Each structure stands twice: as C-alpha cells, then as structure tokens.
Design a protein with these regions (language model features):
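Glycine/small-residue-rich phosphate/adenosyl-binding loop
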Residues: 42-129
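Short beta-strand segments
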Residues: 31, 35-37, 43-48, 135
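A glycine-rich helix N-cap at a beta->alpha junction
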Residues: 70, 74-80, 84, 163-187
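Small-aliphatic-rich amphipathic alpha-helix that forms the alpha element of a beta-alpha
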Residues: 33-34, 84, 105-162
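Short amphipathic alpha-helical segments
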Residues: 1, 23-32, 56
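Glycine-rich, charged/polar anion/phosphate-binding loops
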Residues: 31-35, 67-71, 159-161, 184
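C-terminal helix-cap and adjacent tail motif
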Residues: 3-13, 88, 92, 172-206
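A short N-terminal beta-strand-loop micro-motif at the entrance of redox/enzyme domains
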Residues: 12-28
Length: 206
C-alpha cells in the first residue's frame, strides 16, 4: 500500500477479532515505527508489547472496573490481540540537550527549583513518542490490519511498575493492533467536518 493510501485509509478501529497477529510482523512494524524523527538523535522512545493474555495487564491498570463493565466499546477493544505501549524517557532528552553540541539551546538547564523540564515549552520526548505512534498506526494500516490509539488517562505508575519499566520513563499511550471484526460502530466524532483544505492550511498569513 502506498503511503498516501495508508494515510487516507487510516481509521481508529474499536472492535477487534481475537485472532493472533504474526509476532514477526509486529516486530517489523515496531522497528519501522522507531525510525521516526528523534530530537538530537536522542532515541528516547521505547515500546513494550503485550500479546495474548498479557494484554490484561494494560486493561487492569489503565482502566477502571466501572468503565470496563459499562463501556459499550470495551469488549471490542479488549479483544485486540496486541497492545503496544509507547514509552518515552524525559531524562534521555534532558541529558542529551546538556551535552556540548546542544548546550547552547538552554534546554539542558535547571530552574531555581532544580526542575530541568521547565525549560521546554513543548517537550520533545512527547513529540517523538507521537511520531513513533503515528508511524505504527500507518504501518498497521498498510499491513491490512486495524489499529487504535488510546491515550494515557489513568494508572500510569502502577502500569509501569507492573511491567518492570525503569524509573523515569513515561507512558505516552497504547496502540491496539489486530484484525477488524466488522462489528465496529462508527464514532459520533466522525460527523464532525474534517480539518482539510483551505480551512486548515494557511499560506503566508492566517
């Protein structure tokens, strides 16, 4: 599938078949996802892949029992055979931008309270995690599978601890991967007009 076709075909899938996905394909998709832009070539993004029964760890910590029992979409989402968790390391970027060739940026310095993150108007670590997640979504689409991105809303620290993630890493979001089961209900959000064309692209001036 050509890139333009993958971009235009990509949709968030919220109902999956439980059929397993080839682990070699998952590895290839993640390797491609890690080829995205990386500020200062820091490479401070990583993925934790949960497959089969291991996906329950994600749902247990990132959602609540009330939500799981009441959300109409939960059964379809929870059938996704792969849950890939996008992680990023703020410390990796803070250290990288404190090195000699980046020190002039001022992004590796601390404020009066010793907070090194306050110098960053837009933290690069979240941007790089987003680039990687988008590449994974596009790669999954190009492979003929369905995918959905779920943000980090709750349970971040317990989830990281349960997975043995080293201290200092942040959970950015989860990409669900699997075959579509044909039972997805279109999101009401799709009724909103797309942000394309003259309304969203401005030349020379807003």
């Amino acid at each position: 599938m050509e890139l333009t076709e993958a971009i235009r075909r990509r949709r968030m899938v919220r109902s999956f078949a439980p059929d397993p996905v080839d682990p070699d394909l998952v590895d290839r998709l993640l390797e491609d996802a890690l080829r995205g832009p990386s500020a200062g070539n820091t490479r401070g993004v990583a993925w934790v892949v949960l497959q089969g029964g291991d996906t329950a760890t994600y749902w247990e910590h990132a959602t609540t029992a009330d939500w799981r029992s009441s959300a109409r979409r939960y059964p379809g989402l929870s059938r996704a055979p792969v849950v890939a968790l996008s992680l990023c390391s703020p410390a990796a970027y803070l250290d990288r931008y404190g090195e000699a060739d980046k020190r002039h940026s001022g992004l590796g310095t601390s404020d009066s309270d010793g907070n090194r993150e306050s110098a960053w108007p837009i933290p690069y670590w979240f941007g790089d995690a987003a680039f990687s997640a988008l590449l994974l979504l596009l790669g999954v689409t190009a492979a003929g599978l369905g995918a959905a991105f779920l943000g980090n809303f709750r349970g971040e620290q317990p989830l990281l601890e349960a997975l043995g993630v080293p201290d200092g890493w942040r959970f950015f979001g989860a990409v669900l991967i699997g075959e579509r089961d044909g039972l997805d209900h279109p999101s009401p959000s799709l009724r909103r007009p797309p942000a394309v064309g003259a309304g969203a692209i401005h030349r020379s001036h807003w």
